[in-house]
Amino acid sequence: MKTRTQQIEELQKEWTQPRWEGITRPYSAEEVVKLRGSVNPECTLAQLGAAKMWRLLHGEAKKGYINSLGALTGGQALQQAKAGIEAIYLSGWQVAADANLASSMYPDQSLYPANSVPAVVDRINNTFRRADQIQWASGIEPNDPRYVDYFLPIVADAEAGFGGVLNAFELMKSMIEAGAAAVHFEDQLASVKKCGHMGGKVLVPTQEAIQKLVAARLAADVMGVPTLVIARTDADAADLITSDCDPYDSGFITGERTSEGFYRTHAGIEQAISRGLAYAPYADLVWCETSTPDLELARRFADAIHAKYPGKLLAYNCSPSFNWQKNLDDKTIASFQQQLSDMGYKYQFITLAGIHSMWFNMFDLAHAYAQGEGMKHYVEKVQQPEFAAAKDGYTFVSHQQEVGTGYFDKVTTIIQGGASSVTALTGSTEEAQF
């Protein structure tokens, strides 16, 4: 076990590495170690994911940038890994709607239990672990061309932290324990938090938003994991703020008050840039939430951030809340992500891809099945396309194998001394027909 002094010296040395260039910590290594306790458990999946995410952002991504899809189940994340996606995005919106621990359906207003997103991170990582175990038990190793690296980095949504700085600190720790690689925090008031594409958003003072980023970084340092911190600002659209206490915000406050006591602000890109510049020293990536897929707006934000912080990584929400074809022509849509990447937006994601795909495809199947010729539509819309997708690496046609039946047959056989009459795949319809 390392002594307190050894841990402090090790941490001080770590912070001089290129990984931390441009990152401000308003606390000391001694203060971090003081909060750790005598035993600091390792968070292997979080460590692995954070390191992968950092490498992807710095040249290893196939396209030169990471483009993620939102997932809300382990199975969705598994299929993304098989299909070649390089990182998973887990949005609070999707968790609120269909994957929270209250077992209810909510809008994106931080109404669900605060430990719900960490629970889904854990569930996705457990699915990755099972898929990896199945692959490994089948004799497929990393040097095999059939090998799939299932342990994709997970970028998780912490919303506005579900409270104050202590809530943000504890939530970040829970995310890391579950295996998140990166976590984002937004600058809204947690008690009335809204989806970035809703009205009624209320900002907290810039200094308070910074303190939540510091809380997140401190939590990661206490856990001993280089988790990426992503700072999101909603200041492009939000025209309310809780207080005029922070001089940094004074240039945007109009003087008008609301019935709740909030202050009106001048929403827009200048307010967003101001916030982005304030957050940049405390975050690994900066994200400006926008109302439309606007390349010029994205360029203005990127140019302003990079004028003061050259090379600062940026994130962009390619949201389903945008009507893409209403805003852009097909050619621009096709080149949109590459153009963003050229501006420095190296992490791009479709927040609600998982839930839109899941709900639409079920409606499409159910409508045809209910209105038409029954099994014909299941075969045409699901089974035959699944067979056709096998050439691209899709394997869920053999659904018993996919979820681990063969793996647990191996467990049974080992326990029973090498022979068993109760294994599940032998004699199954999958063995006979697929």
From Swiss-Prot:
Record function comment: Involved in the metabolic adaptation in response to environmental changes. Catalyzes the reversible formation of succinate and glyoxylate from isocitrate, a key step of the glyoxylate cycle, which operates as an anaplerotic route for replenishing the tricarboxylic acid cycle during growth on fatty acid substrates.
Gene: aceA
Sites where the protein binds substrate: S91, G92, W93, G196, H197, R232, N317, C318, S319, P320, S321, T351
Enzyme class: lyase
Protein name per the record: Isocitrate lyase
Functional pathway: Carbohydrate metabolism; glyoxylate cycle; (S)-malate from isocitrate: step 1/2
Catalytic activity: D-threo-isocitrate = glyoxylate + succinate
Quaternary context: Homotetramer.
Outcome, altering A432S: In strain: S2978, S2979, S2980, S2983, S2985, S2993, S2995, S3013, S3014, S3015, S3027, S3041, S3044, S3057 and S3333
Gene3D superfamilies in the record: Phosphoenolpyruvate-binding domains (3.20.20.60)
